[in-house]
């Protein structure tokens, strides 16, 4: 075996972001602990980026190295994924694990990221705690005019991690437009790094 990639989702409510923290629980810590137990050896998982405290993630790519062999623990990555999901808490799930080339890196091979921001204007028990609730009418045209100003290619060095070693701080925000669905609005954005 060699380099493996996984795609995971998480409800970040109970976590202090993706990255391992010295005094707080993180998604990375939980995933590494469960994956290490499953694989039978200490395993470090590298994520495609970071998330802040309480942030949810969907289709978050991460990779790890594994030199073991399929056998008594699991027959293939599909079975390993199924077993790993049985070990993980309900707020973290892994969609898939698959082998990748040694040059593939979750963070440095990532070419694009997408974010969705949620706002809801009516009572919706499925969105409470996952979306900003607004109690007044919203001007969608004005919101989209403001969002259009986010679509540009420019310098984003103010948002980088200090000493993070980024190759570039130029970001190309390609899309930012609010859409309405029943009682909630979403702002899907995409950018290339």
Task: Show which residues each predicted segment covers.
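Conserved small/polar residues in nucleotide/adenosyl-binding loops
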Residues: 1-9, 183-189
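Short, charge-patterned binding micro-sites
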Residues: 43-69, 104
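Short amphipathic alpha-helices in soluble, non-transmembrane regions
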Residues: 75-87
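Short catalytic helix/loop segments, enriched in acidic residues and glycine
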Residues: 24-34
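Short acidic, Gly/Ser-rich segments with clustered Asp/Glu that frequently serve as metal-coordination loops
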Residues: 13-19
């Amino acid at each position: 075996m060699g380099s493996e990639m996984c795609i995971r989702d998480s409800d970040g409510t109970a976590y202090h972001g993706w990255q391992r923290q010295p005094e707080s629980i993180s998604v990375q810590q939980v995933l590494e602990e469960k994956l290490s137990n499953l694989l039978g050896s200490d395993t470090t998982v590298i994520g495609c980026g970071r998330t802040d405290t309480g942030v949810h993630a969907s289709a978050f790519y991460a990779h790890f190295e594994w030199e073991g062999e399929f056998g008594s623990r699991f027959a293939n990555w599909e079975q390993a994924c199924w077993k790993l999901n049985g070990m993980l808490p309900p707020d973290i799930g892994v969609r898939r694990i698959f082998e990748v080339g040694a040059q593939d890196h979750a963070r440095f091979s990532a070419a694009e990221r997408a974010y969705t921001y949620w706002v809801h204007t009516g009572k919706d028990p499925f969105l409470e705690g996952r979306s900003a609730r607004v109690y007044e009418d919203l001007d969608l045209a004005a919101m989209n005019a403001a969002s259009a100003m986010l679509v540009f290619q420019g310098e984003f060095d103010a948002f980088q991690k200090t000493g993070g070693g980024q190759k570039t701080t130029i970001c190309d925000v390609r899309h930012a437009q609010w859409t309405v669905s029943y009682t909630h609005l979403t702002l899907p954005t995409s950018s290339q790094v």
